[in-house]
UniProtKB/Swiss-Prot annotation:
<feature type="binding site">
    <location>
        <position position="59"/>
    </location>
    <ligand>
        <name>Mg(2+)</name>
    </ligand>
</feature>
<keyword id="KW-0131">Cell cycle</keyword>
<feature type="binding site">
    <location>
        <begin position="57"/>
        <end position="61"/>
    </location>
    <ligand>
        <name>GTP</name>
    </ligand>
</feature>
<dbReference type="GO" id="GO:0005525">
    <property type="term" value="F:GTP binding"/>
</dbReference>
<dbReference type="InterPro" id="IPR030393">
    <property type="entry name" value="G_ENGB_dom"/>
</dbReference>
<keyword id="KW-0342">GTP-binding</keyword>
<feature type="binding site">
    <location>
        <begin position="75"/>
        <end position="78"/>
    </location>
    <ligand>
        <name>GTP</name>
    </ligand>
</feature>
<comment type="similarity">
    <text>Belongs to the TRAFAC class TrmE-Era-EngA-EngB-Septin-like GTPase superfamily. EngB GTPase family.</text>
</comment>
<protein>
    <recommendedName>
        <fullName>Probable GTP-binding protein EngB</fullName>
    </recommendedName>
</protein>
<dbReference type="InterPro" id="IPR019987">
    <property type="entry name" value="GTP-bd_ribosome_bio_YsxC"/>
</dbReference>
<feature type="binding site">
    <location>
        <position position="37"/>
    </location>
    <ligand>
        <name>Mg(2+)</name>
    </ligand>
</feature>
<dbReference type="GO" id="GO:0000917">
    <property type="term" value="P:division septum assembly"/>
</dbReference>
<keyword id="KW-0479">Metal-binding</keyword>
<dbReference type="GO" id="GO:0046872">
    <property type="term" value="F:metal ion binding"/>
</dbReference>
<dbReference type="InterPro" id="IPR006073">
    <property type="entry name" value="GTP-bd"/>
</dbReference>
<dbReference type="Pfam" id="PF01926">
    <property type="entry name" value="MMR_HSR1"/>
</dbReference>
<feature type="binding site">
    <location>
        <begin position="30"/>
        <end position="37"/>
    </location>
    <ligand>
        <name>GTP</name>
    </ligand>
</feature>
């Protein structure tokens, strides 16, 4: 897959505001502050396309980006962030369950795991949720540049042991771009 253009389309806080299902959607999911926005910016080559923050929980809406005029990248709120109210967590949970569970246009869910803390309980719960809804998914181990080779090997093995249904596992660095071409090649298989 080659990305020639990318643009922000809209943010959605209610399922009734989702765009028409006219293009396939690749959804980016993961814990808060795992690097979803950085990954989107790295993949598209557009540094400020998705807003990044060092503060967890900044993405609170479903954000749509149109790529090549025929594909959506969708950035969804991170899970596992403790500093929001229970009511807000419940609202996010209902929004995401409705979106991921029912949206026919979803071609692939890309589950991002911090390679320094792979396969935490919340990540395993998300894998179970995706399997329950029969959603194809792949895993991206983010922040690869922060690990030694030994730590990378351990992170990949730990992830493989609990991600039996994942279509792929890619180690990725948004800083260096390591893993970018491999990940884009995987996307082609689902479109």
């Amino acid at each position: 897959m080659k990305i020639t253009n990318a643009a922000f389309v809209r943010s959605v806080s209610d399922l009734s505001d989702l765009p028409e299902e006219s293009f396939p959607e690749i959804v980016f999911a993961g814990r808060s502050n795992v690097g979803k926005s950085s990954l989107l910016n790295s993949l598209t080559g557009r540094k400020g396309l998705a807003k990044t923050s060092s503060t967890p929980g900044k993405t609170r809406l479903i954000n749509y980006f149109l790529l090549n005029d025929n594909l959506y990248f969708v950035d969804i709120p991170g899970y596992g962030y403790a500093a929001v109210s229970h009511a807000e967590k419940d609202a996010w949970g209902r929004l995401l369950a409705g979106y991921v569970g029912d949206r026919a246009a979803i071609a692939l869910v890309v589950l991002l795991l911090d390679s320094r803390h792979p396969a935490m309980k919340s990540d395993r719960d998300m894998m179970d949720f995706l399997a329950y809804h029969d959603r194809p998914y792949g895993i991206v181990l983010t922040k690869d540049d922060k690990l030694t080779q030994k730590e990378r090997t351990h992170a990949k093995r730990a992830t493989e042991s609990c991600a039996m249904n994942a279509g792929f596992i890619v180690s990725y660095s948004s800083v260096s771009g390591k893993g970018k071409n491999e990940l884009l090649d995987h996307f082609d298989r689902y479109l």
